[in-house]
Amino acid sequence: MALSISMNAQAQTTNSRFAAKESLSLTNEWDKTFPKSEKVMHEKVTFVNRFGITLAADLYRPKTVNGKLPALAVSGPFGAVKEQSSGLYAQRLAEEGFLTVAFDPSFTGESGGSPRYSSSMDINTEDFCAAVDYLSCRKDVDSERIGIIGICGWGGIALNAAALDPRIKVTVAVTLYNMTRVTQQGYFDSMDEEGRYQLKKQLSEQRTEEFRKGEILPQGGLPDVPTDDATEFLKQYIAYYKSEKRGYHSRSLNSNMGWNITSTLMMLNQNLWIAASEVRTPVLIVHGEKAHSRYFGEEAYQKLTSGKYADNKRLLIVPSATHCDLYDGGEGNFIPWNEIVDFVKRSIK
């Protein structure tokens, strides 16, 4: 009996340790969809989340600023990689004096995790918290001045992380989606309960078939060219993710074969923003006036300001901007850099 107790104690001690880092294959060349800034230093870094998945990130640090810096973790859009929009935001904020990391979420890009091209709101929220772990323990970071920026679906995930983790002192959610709402209700809330049931049935049957064959299948991704009846926002996605001159990247699942077919199943029973009214720290919601997703930003702002912590929340609508214009600026340079930088600096001064 004593031996059994001793063995159990040893097992508990062993299991409580962080997982060893996965061996990742990281590129060394500059393979971003945006030009390299001469104002910042860049390096690849890795860190492990609480699910044992090793995340790969690009770290940007201003060349002319020393000492402990305020820091930001950046991710998104949903299905993108750090070489796309999140890297652009991270590099631009580093030019403003922040140490930043743009990371690939679990199961995607250069990060670890298997099966590939899977999503989980729990694990992805943990990805943000793991980035805060990493930043908090860097000697060149002021651990009391850490924030996060989420783009598209990762804007919604950022709100969930902010509600969970008081170490996050400021949050910026750009052109955000509520991934659980759009999964459960469809675009513009077009799906009813029967539609949800049929989707659950379809995805559950897909799971059975995949288990039988031992293979998890991708959705197929965006078409290279939109059909005549494609929605305007689908055309905008294609124009960004499929264009070599704009946002295409070989490791981006949005640019290629897309998410796993069953990846969204668990979102059908989740409420990502259930604690949004409890976010005490400042939040800036940035959305385009003409974005198909604007209603998600307005929903987020309503939830954030429905409780007693409303005073430090702001909704910024960018005139004439669409959803994807805020990925890279679009043709009108729509990203409101000055407003974002000012909000973050004032919030964590």
Residue ranges and their predicted role:
Residues L159-S243:
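Alpha/beta-hydrolase-fold enzymes
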Residues V279, I285-H287:
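Short beta-strand/loop motif that positions the catalytic acidic residue
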Residues R92-G112:
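Conserved alpha/beta-hydrolase
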Residues A20-G67:
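N-terminal cap/lid segment of alpha/beta-hydrolase-fold proteins
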Residues G67-P77:
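Short beta-strand element of the alpha/beta-hydrolase
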Residues S118-K139:
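Alpha/beta-hydrolase active-site loop
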Residues A321-N333:
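Catalytic histidine-centered segment of alpha/beta-hydrolase-like enzymes
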Residues G79-Q91, P105, G297:
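The serine-hydrolase catalytic nucleophile loop
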